[in-house]
Amino acid sequence: MEYLKPPEFKLSEIYDKILMGITKKKEDDGTVYRLFDEYHKLLPCLLEAESDYYSFAEDNKLYLIEERSRMSQVIDSDDMKWLYTQKFLKTGRGFYDKLRARPKNSICPYCGKRDVYELDHYLSKSDYPQYAVTPANLIPCCHRCNHKKLSKKVHGISDLVLNPYFDDINTGQWLFCTFEVQ
């Protein structure tokens, strides 16, 4: 696995740009509207969640993060998915492309074989909506690795895959051997 430095930009630097152009969001049934103000009110919760993410990730304890934070009282996971797919991927496309371009030679850091094609939500946006647009939660990867991982539930440390931003496996010794001369 290729180690990548965590993104140089954080949510506070990109959130307003992602929100540009939001006036309302029409739900499927045509009756509920989400206004810009509702997304803007989320920012303090999302920034706190991002800070928690870094703290847990640096201690290799992302499995301890709560699935849904208190932000779910304000806005639901479908709204955060919408924010990612309709705004981050479109008005925030420059940030998406910067994240996608991070691996050396555009090779997937998970498998080291295929070209980076998309971003993986390390903690799924369905179970952890508070991290749907958190740059450190978005890992550049190939299509196959992203879909092989999918949104596996995290119940403990054994459920986590290596995180290219926080797990540098290239610095430790993994193979030990002893030679005896006869």
PLM segments and residue spans:
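A sequence-composition feature that detects small, non-aromatic residues
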Residues: 48-51, 57, 101, 132, ...
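Generic alpha-helix signal with a bias toward terminal, lower-confidence helices
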Residues: 13, 58, 108-111, 131-135, ...
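N-terminal start-of-chain detector that recognizes signal peptides
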Residues: 80-81, 90, 110-112, 148
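Glycine- and acidic-residue-rich phosphate-binding/metal-coordinating active-site segment common to enzymes
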Residues: 115-182
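Short Cys/His-rich Zn2+-coordinating modules
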Residues: 85-98, 120-127
